UniProtKB/Swiss-Prot annotation, chains A, B, C, D:
One GO location term (cellular component): cytosol
Record gene name: aroC
Protein name: Chorismate synthase
Assembly and oligomerization: Homotetramer.
Binding annotation for FMN: 125-127, 238-239, 278, 293-297, 319
C-alpha cells in the first residue's frame, strides 16, 4: 500500500496540497445503505477550520466538501465515495524567498531530501491542510459506528501547555474554542493564549480521544492490534509526537496489583488498559491520549539554512496560531473512527459466524 | 494484509503459540547478497530469553533458530527466508482450571470474545513467546542496515519503576541483566527487583531505542510516515502502552522557540524532533521511547470471572518475572530495525543495489 | 487493500459512476520530477471515447481531465496526483423501469446481490465509464516508462469477430477507428460492423498489447509474478474473459522443443514466453492478448427477471456499439503501463533516481 | 505486500526452494472452529506429487506436511497456521556446471538478472516444488468452503496436447493418472505420453477448474473483481500461459445474442459468463480454464548461454516428465479455493448486514 492510503477494508486515500487546486479523498469499503450527505461531513469540518472562535462570521477557508460518487438517493451504494474540497483561499504570495530556505522544524528539509524538490507554497503536502479530508472521511466512519453499532467517538483538550483540565464535562467541549471539557479553565487558557500571541511564540497540547460502546473482539493480533493501529493513525497526524493508551506512561511506575483491571460479574473495576487487552477491544471505553508539539511557524526568528547550506534567518509571517494542537481534536476523533470502522469490518468478516455466549462486562 | 504480517516491501509474517509445536516466521523482501547465518539471529535471541541473568548456565527455553530457506552458500538469495524455533520447554501441566477462567489484565477475555475459544495453555498466541520470531527477523534487518548503510539500532532501559537512569553509556548496556546504561543504578535496580519478587508484585518500565546513521528521506507521508510506522511497530509489542518520538509528551509544555531544532551549516542544534520531521527521517538520530506495563501474571490473587460469568480468584503460579518490560529491549530494537528496513526498501527499491554484469539479450 | 485500489508502490485508486457527479482517481507513488500536464492524459482519453470515428466533431462525453494536485511548476512532486473528470453528458432519463429489472449478462443481478441495491442509472459503477480514469492514470505511467526507461507500450486490435489481422503495422493502428494494424482488413471490418449495427447484434474482439524495451528483472515471484499481475490487471477490464501471455493457449499443443525460446549471444531465437520467464521479465517484448465478450446492451429483446423473480423482456435503447471490445485498446495499454510502473518501482525504488546535492546535516 | 503473500483477509505466505531444508507456509485469517488435521492436507498433497501413477508404492518425495500452530484440540483457533514439509529427497549432485549456465525457457536467466545470483540447485525458488505449499494451504480453504458453505472446487484435465476430452465424468477424474474425466481418452493419452517419453520431448496441457455452490455476491469491483483475482492466482502457477473464464476466447466470435446468459425464474439458460458477471459471482458454477506450457527440462539439447554470454548446449538429465501440466490440477483447485475463501471473508465482512430477498437463480 502506498503512503497515502490508510486502512485495510475501510480505506481512505487522500490527495491535495495547501495551495493546489483542491483537496480530495476516496473512501472505499463503506458498506451500502448508510444515509450520507454533505452535511454529515461539513459539521465536523466546520469544527476544525480556523476562525471558528474569534472570527465566527468570517470564513477564510471555505472548506466546503462535495460528494462526487458512492451515494445514490441519499444512501451509500457500497462503491467508492469520492470527496472534494476546492481550495479557495489561495492568496498569491511571493514565495520565492521561502523556496530556497529550509525552515527549522518544518518538513522543508526532509521533503527536499526525499523528493529532490518540493511545493514550497505554504508547506505543500506537509501542511496541515490535508487533514481536512481525514475529518471528512472520519465523519463517514463516525456516522456508521454510531448508527449501526451505537459507538460514540469523542475527543477533548486535556492539557494546553501547563494548564491541565480537572473535570470532564462533554457538554462543555463545544462551548469554547479550545474543546476544553472544564469550564473553570477556559479563561485561564484564553489569557495564556493571548500572552503567547503577543510574544509571538507557541505551545504544545494534549488531546484525549474516547470511544464508548465498542464491542469486545476488535483488533487483529499480532501486528494489527487495535492499539497498534490506533497508535499508527494518531501518530500520523501532523505535530503528534506521542501516543498513549489507557494508563500510558503512568504504567511505568504502577505495580501489577495496581495496574490490572480486575473483573467482577458487575463489570471491570478500573480501566488502566484503556479498553484494549492483548491488542483486542475489551468492551471498555477505548481511551487514547496524544501529545502535540508547538507550531514552528513563528515570527520570532529562527536559524535555518538554504539549499546550498548557507545559514539564513527564518521568519514566518501571516496568520499565527499559538497552539495548533487544539485543532487536532476533530482529526484525532476522525482517525479513531476510521480505525474502528476498519477493524469492525475486518472482524465482522473473519469471525461473523462466531457465537459467544459469555457475558460482556460493563464498567462499574 | 492480515494481522500477522508486518511491512510493505520487507515483510515479516509470524506464527506460533507458547505451547504449540514451534514458532516460525517468513521474512520476505530481504535483498540478495547479504551474508546471513543462524548465529546472526541467535545472538539477539539469547539476549532476550529468560535466565540469562541469574541462571546463565541453565537454558530453560532453548530458542534455537533454524534457517529453512532463502540463504544459499551463506548469502541471502532474495527469496523468502523461513525461520523456525521448535518449542522444547513445554511442560505438560494441568490447565483445565485456567481454561475456564479469564485472568484479569490478560488477553483471555478478549481472545475469547474474538475467536469464541482460545488456546489457553500459557497464553497461546497472546503470550510473549511470539516475540522471539520478531527478534530473529529483526536481526536480519539490523545486519542489513549496519552492513549496507552503516545504520546502528540500539536500545536500553531508561527507567525501571521509579528508578531513572541518568547516564547513557552504551558499553554498560550489556554488562548487567537490565540493559541499564548507567552503572550507578544497577544495584538499586537489583535490590528493587528482589523486593518485588518477595512481594510477589510487578512493575513497569521505559525502554528507549535509538537509530543512528539513518539517511534523510525515509518515510512515506502522509499515512505511512516513519514515526507513524514506528509507533505501530512498537505499540504492537506485548505490554506496550505508550510510544514517544523525540521530546514526546514533553512537547506539551515546550514553547515553539524551545522545541524547534535550529539548523546551522555545522548541523542541527538539538533533536527534539527525534530524527523525524514531517514524517520523514532528517538524518538525525531517531529516538523513540516506550512504556511497558507491569505483568499481570502474579501469585497475588486477583479478581477474575469464569466463562459463565461467575467470580473467581485468580492466581498465577510458576516462574515469576517482576519486570517483563526489561525483556522488551531486544524486541524494540528488532521492530525499529524492521521498520527502517522496510522504509529503506520503499524509498530505494529492493534490488536497487544489485549490479548485474551479465549481458542483456536482445531479440534476433 | 480495497477493491478500488490497484498496485503496491504505484497505486491507482478510482471512484465514480456513469451518472454520478464526476469520475476521479488518485495516483500515489509517482516519483517526483516527471513533466506532466493535462494534455498527456487528454490525448489517451480522446482515443478512448465514443464518437471519435463517425462523429469526430461531436463530443458527447467531454471527458476533460483536470489535475488537482501532485504537480507543481509542470512537474510531479512525488505527492499524490488527484485527477477529476466531471460528468457532463448526463441525460435525465426515466430509469424507473430499469431499476426493477435485471438485464441478462449485465452486472445488475450480481451488484444487487452484493450490495442489496444499486445505482441503476446506466450501469452505475459497473459501467465502462470508470475505465476513463484508468486511461488517465495509465497515461502518467506510460510517460514515465517512455521518458525515463525507454519503454514503449502499444496495443492493437488483432481480431474483430471472425476477421483476423495478418500484418502488424504500427503506423496503421491510429489511421482507422478500429485500432487495426492491417490496412487491408479495415473495409471488411467496416462492412461487418455496419451489418451488425443493422441487425442490432454485437460481437467480441481480441486485443494485443505489447511492451518493448522492458529491462529484465521485473516481477516479484511467486505470487506477484509479472504475468500474474498483468493477468489481474487485464482481466479487471470490463468485458475481458480471457488473458494470454506469449504463445498462450497455443502452448497446449506445442512440443517442448518448439516452445522453448533458445538463447544465443546475439539474442533469443523466438518469444513464445511473451517476454516473461519464471514470472520475471526477460528483456524480450512482453506480449499479452485479451478476449473481449460482445456487449449485452442490445435492442434485440432478451430474457431477464425483475427484482421479485418474475420474467421480463429486456430491451436496451440508446446508443448502440456493436463491438465495445475495440475501445478496450487504450485501456489495455493503460493497465499494462500501470503494472510495469508498479513493478519497476518495486524493483528499483520510488526515489531511486532522485539525486539530491543538498548537504546532509550532522548533529552538533 | 510482498510477492510471496497472496490474499487480503485469508492470506497465504510461502517459503522454500527445491533443495533447501524445507518448504513452509503460514496461513493467516482462517476463521476459528474449523476441524483441521494433517490428513486434510496430505490427501491433496499425495495427489500432486510425482510417482503416484507408475510407481504408486515408491515415495520419492515424501511431502509429509506438519501443522505447527493455529490448531488446538483438532480445531483452528483463528491464529496463524504454520505448515512445514521437510525436504527429504535432496540428492547431492554436481550442479557446478549448471550454476554457470542459463537453460533456455527456464527462469535461470531472469532470476539472475533480478537477484544477481541464484540458487541453481534444481531451479531453487523457481522450481515447481513451492507449489506443494499452495496445495496444502488450498486444502484448508477447500475444507472451509465445503463444510461451511457447501462450495465444491474440482478440476480436471480437458486437453493433453492434441487430445481433447469429450465427456465430463467426475468419477473418472481420480481413476487415472491424468485427472482425465473421459475414460475413453485414457489409453490414447498413455500411448501419447509413452511416445513422448521415448522422444525425450514434452507437451502442454489444458486444465479446467470448476467451483459449484458459490453464493452470488463475491468479488470486489473494480480491481479485485473475482475473475481478476482468479486470473492472478492461476497465472501465478508455474507454466501457466493463459487463463479463461467461461466462454473465454470463444467470446471473440460470439454474437451478443449468443453469448448472453438469459435469465428465467427457473434459472440461467446458459453459462458463457462462467459464473462471474461484472466481476462478481452470480451463483452459477465458476468455470476457469488454463493453458500450461510444455516443460523445458529436456534431455534433447537446446541452445543456452553462460553467465559470460558464451553459447552453450544445454541438456537436462534426471527424471523426465513429458507433461508437467497434468500436475497443475490440484494446484489450480487450491488457488481457486484460496481466492474464493479470501473473497468470502472480504464480502461477509463488508456486507454481512445486507439482506437480499431477491431469489437466487439456479441453473437449468
Amino acid at each position: 500500500m502506498s503512503g497515502n492510503t490508510f486502512g485495510k477494508l475501510f480505506t481512505v486515500t487522500t490527495f491535495g496540497e495547501s495551495h493546489g487546486a483542491a483537496l480530495g479523498c476516496i473512501i472505499d469499503g463503506c458498506p451500502p445503505g448508510l444515509e450520507l450527505s454533505e452535511e454529515d461531513m461539513q459539521r465536523d469540518l466546520d469544527r476544525r477550520k480556523p476562525g471558528t472562535s474569534r472570527h465566527t462570521t468570517q470564513r477564510r477557508e471555505a472548506d466546503e466538501v462535495r460528494i462526487l460518487s458512492g451515494v445514490f438517493e441519499g444512501k451509500t451504494t457500497g462503491t467508492p465515495i469520492g470527496l472534494i474540497i476546492e481550495n479557495t483561499d489561495q492568496r498569491s504570495k511571493d514565495y520565492s524567498r521561502i523556496a530556497a530556505q529550509f525552515r527549522p522544524a518544518h518538513a522543508d528539509y526532509t521533503y527536499h531530501h526525499k523528493y529532490g524538490a518540493r511545493d514550497y507554497r505554504g508547506g505543500g503536502r506537509s501542511s496541515a491542510r490535508e487533514t481536512a479530508m481525514r475529518v471528512a472521511a472520519g465523519a463517514v466512519a463516525r456516522k456508521f459506528l454510531e448508527q449501526r453499532l451505537g459507538i460514540k467517538v469523542r475527543g477533548y483538550l486535556s492539557q494546553l501547555g501547563p494548564i491541565k483540565t480537572d473535570k470532564l464535562d462533554w457538554e462543555q467541549v463545544h462551548q469554547n474554542p479550545f474543546f476544553c471539557p472544564d469550564a473553570d479553565k477556559v479563561s485561564e487558557m484564553e489569557a495564556y493564549m493571548d500572552a503567547l500571541r503577543k510574544e509571538g511564540d507557541s505551545i504544545g497540547a494534549r488531546i484525549n480521544v474516547v470511544a464508548e460502546g465498542v464491542p469486545p473482539g476488535l483488533g487483529e493480533p499480532i501486528f494489527d492490534r487495535l492499539d497498534a493501529d490506533l497508535a499508527h493513525a494518531l501518530m500520523s497526524i501532523n505535530a503528534v509526537k506521542g501516543v498513549e493508551i489507557g494508563a500510558g506512561f503512568d504504567c511505568i511506575e504502577q505495580k501489577g496489583t495496581e495496574h490490572r483491571d480486575e473483573m467482577t460479574p458487575e463489570g471491570f473495576l478500573s480501566n488502566n488498559a484503556g479498553g484494549v487487552l492483548g491488542g483486542i477491544s475489551s468492551g471498555q471505553p477505548i481511551v487514547a491520549s496524544i501529545a502535540l508539539k508547538p507550531t514552528s511557524s513563528l515570527r520570532l526568528p529562527g536559524k535555518g539554512i538554504d539549499v546550498d547550506g548557507n545559514p539564513v534567518e527564518v521568519i514566518t509571517t501571516g496568520r499565527h496560531d499559538p497552539c495548533v494542537g487544539i485543532r487536532a481534536t476533530p482529526i484525532a476523533e476522525a482517525m479513531m473512527a476510521i480505525v474502528l470502522m476498519d477493524h469492525y469490518l475486518r472482524h465482522r468478516g473473519q469471525n461473523g459466524d462466531v457465537e459467544v455466549t459469555t457475558p460482556v462486562l460493563g464498567q462499574l
